[in-house]
Amino acid sequence: MDVHTNNWRYFHHGCDVMAHLVIPEDLIEGLYAEDRPKIFSCTLKVIDYQTNLVSEPVIVWARSIDHRHTVGTLTSGIALSIPLLLTNDTWHPFNIILLRFAETANHNACYVRFFYQTIFSGLIKAGAPPVEEVNHPPVELPPREDPLVNILQGRSGRQFPATEESTNDHTASQKLVIGEAASAYLNHRALERSPSLRGALAGEIFSSSGASNLSGSVPPANRQARRTALVNLVGTKDFTKDMLRLLPLTHCLSGKRFWLCMYNPEGYKNLVSCLNHLSEDELKKINPLSIIQQDTSFLTLKMNQFVDSLLEECRAANFRMQQVLGVAIRSDASNALEYVQEQFYEACFTLRCATNENSGWVKAAVATQSRKQGVWLDVISLWDQGVGSWGVSLKLPNPLPGLHTLACIQQLSCQLEGKHKYLLESVCAKDDQIAVLHSHTLNAWLLLPGGFAIKGKFTHSEKDLLHISSRYGV
């Protein structure tokens, strides 16, 4: 596979281990490979289990495989490579590999996580010799005689009982035909005797007269002369189908299968896990899902803080809401106030349970850390009535408002153009659906059906911003 070959050429000098993978598209939720080019890039980061720090991003090549571009017998999926580093010649099984596939014009970025344990266990298994080779030592076969060597050395392939008379006749006949062994010619006597015209063995063993320069013996015919390569291209290796070995692995976070591609017999069997050096008491303190739980808890905490800020704003305004968008409520509810209250209560409950890495507040935090501007919209369905949209970037021709006041939302709605021109109104005109408008200033507004808006805010420390940008930044 060309992608595996190129990744190996570009990255194998800067990493300790490189794993070549084929990942099925259904394992990468939200990939939409049909909207991407056949060859594209993705970003790889590693989250260290012990320090919870994220490595520098590495951009690797990926390819959508099909019937024309296959990996062995595989005709679908995404082929890519993962360059990895060791720590003191050991690897931690619970480090997390974070793959980020960039957003497209119509879809958000998507993330896939792998444990070191999954990848390295596959490498070790693939690098180990087959079981039959371990249990059954190789059988030594008796050496086979080469008839050509026998002819050059003056031996006959058929052996007869040797008598003094037959021995003398054989020796005499041999001397008459080819002479002594030391003066034997390598070319026919009717032709020129110079070996330079017919080729010579390495080192000019025979002189121009045809006699040997070495005393007593002719080099064996099966000895090959040493050749020195003119060009040695270190770091270039073409992976072919004949070298390929596919090893199925299971993605432990989803239970789906993907494939490890082994092209060369590298010695991965000597890779050592750092857990091998820990005592039994130390092993009991390890939580394999620590990083996953911390990231999920962090996202949930931020959403809870936002909902708390909404409730504080409502209490400060004595639970009075203002309608900022002139949208009628499309509902058969007899009491509009009770209807809006019901939508608000369900919105608070849903927001506390909803976490998404493509949420507008995540993109706003990344923009704040990198000193960029932007406005994003999250459309969230209530009562599980549909599928929402996360982190929709709103393009504005004029300078972006900071969304500090209600007037900013009205101004923003008037500036939207193209496919987003009536986006806010269309979202607020539907039942069982809410929207959250996010700004790079970390202000956020909850938009309810009917165009009612409540102001909230996300509060991030410097450590929080670094945490978000290191994981979800480009």
Curated annotation (Swiss-Prot):
Keyword tRNA-binding: no
Keywords: Capsid protein, Host nucleus, Late protein, Viral genome packaging, Viral release from host cell, Virion
InterPro entries, sorted: UL17-like
Main location: virion
Subunit composition and interactions: Interacts (via C-terminus) with capsid vertex component 2/CVC2.
Compartments it resides in: Virion; Host nucleus
GO CC term (a single one): viral capsid
Similarity remark: Belongs to the herpesviridae CVC1 protein family.
Described function: Capsid vertex-specific component that plays a role during viral DNA encapsidation, assuring correct genome cleavage and presumably stabilizing capsids that contain full-length viral genomes.
GO terms (BP aspect): chromosome organization
Domain of life: Viruses
Pfam families (alphabetical): Herpes_UL17
Name this protein carries in UniProt: Capsid vertex component 1
